[in-house]
Each structure stands twice: as structure tokens, then as C-alpha cells.
């Protein structure tokens, strides 16, 4: 009687394991299909040209706005374009962005001061910095957003902290 009970219990456990295994196989197949689809989508994006007026650099496309907005409105505008305010990851990308601002002098980038730390719009901390001389300086205690600028007097290009409410051009990256 005890043997029969153990056998029944083991059989139930085996059936449950078999059912779980079958479910996991289905999930694995769905994940594999999603992976293949996303990989193809990524490859299509890498090989496709940027939209009109956008410029390709590396794996991303960039655009400088023709209108001026405050930092938050600029970010929302980029999001509406399925992009984000630019996140600068390297010196070569910084040099590319510098080239985008030749005629406008200032543009918002995806950098802001959060709880005393400069962070990118995706929440990552800043690792490399390209601040212009004596920046960030938080003049008047309210410069919590980052911009890329070209100094009209010296021609120096780099980052500057600015009031988030200032209206200026912005650079989106997708």
C-alpha cells in the first residue's frame, strides 16, 4: 500500500515536471523567435539610411533641431521622433557632435544634474567628460542641464551647464 502511494506520488511529480518542461520549451521557442526578429530589425536599422535631415554616425542617426525649446520640451520632442537627447559616449562622438553645432553655438544634450550627480537621460552616470574650461559652474545655483557649445570668442567646444528653462536648439540621437 505504501509502495503504491509512493508510486502514485512519483507519477504525479513526473507528470508535473513533464508539463513544466513542455511549457518551458514553448517559452524558449518564443524567446528564440523574438531574438531572431529583434536581431533582424537591428541589422535592418544598421544598414538603412537615416531619415531625411538626420545624419549617420556609427550606429546612430542625429538631428539638430531647427527650433529652440527648453531642456524638458527638447527631450519630449526627441521622444516624439522616436529618439532621445544625444548621449555622448566617446571623444570621437563628441567631435562629431561639435561639428553639428558650427552655425548655432549652443544645443541641449541628454545630460542633467540629478541629486548632485550629472547623469544621462538613460540614467547612466557620466564616465568621460568634455566640459569647457571652468565648467560645470552652476552659476546662480540653477544650472542643472547640459548643453554642448562653441564659444563665440575662443572657438572652444565642449559641455556647459545651463538653466533648464533656457530655450535653445537641441540634438536628438536614434
Language model regions located:
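Extracellular, disulfide-bonded carbohydrate-recognition/adhesion ectodomains
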Residues: 1-174
Amino acid at each position: 500500500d505504501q509502495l503504491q502511494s509512493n508510486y502514485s506520488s512519483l507519477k504525479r511529480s513526473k507528470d508535473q515536471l513533464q508539463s513544466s518542461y513542455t511549457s518551458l520549451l514553448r517559452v524558449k521557442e518564443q524567446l528564440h523567435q523574438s531574438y531572431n526578429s529583434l536581431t533582424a530589425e537591428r541589422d535592418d536599422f544598421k544598414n538603412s539610411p537615416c531619415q531625411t535631415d538626420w545624419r549617420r554616425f556609427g550606429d546612430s542617426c542625429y538631428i539638430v533641431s531647427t527650433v529652440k525649446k527648453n531642456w524638458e520640451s527638447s527631450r519630449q520632442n526627441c521622444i516624439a521622433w522616436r529618439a532621445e537627447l544625444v548621449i555622448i559616449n566617446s571623444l570621437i562622438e563628441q567631435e562629431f557632435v561639435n561639428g553639428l553645432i558650427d552655425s548655432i553655438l549652443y544645443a541641449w544634450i541628454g545630460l542633467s544634474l540629478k541629486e548632485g550627480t550629472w547623469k544621462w537621460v538613460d540614467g547612466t552616470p557620466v564616465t568621460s567628460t568634455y566640459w569647457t574650461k571652468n565648467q560645470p559652474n552652476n552659476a546662480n545655483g540653477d544650472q542643472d542641464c547640459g548643453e554642448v557649445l562653441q564659444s563665440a570668442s575662443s572657438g572652444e567646444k565642449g559641455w556647459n551647464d545651463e538653466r533648464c528653462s533656457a530655450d535653445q536648439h537641441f540634438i536628438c540621437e536614434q
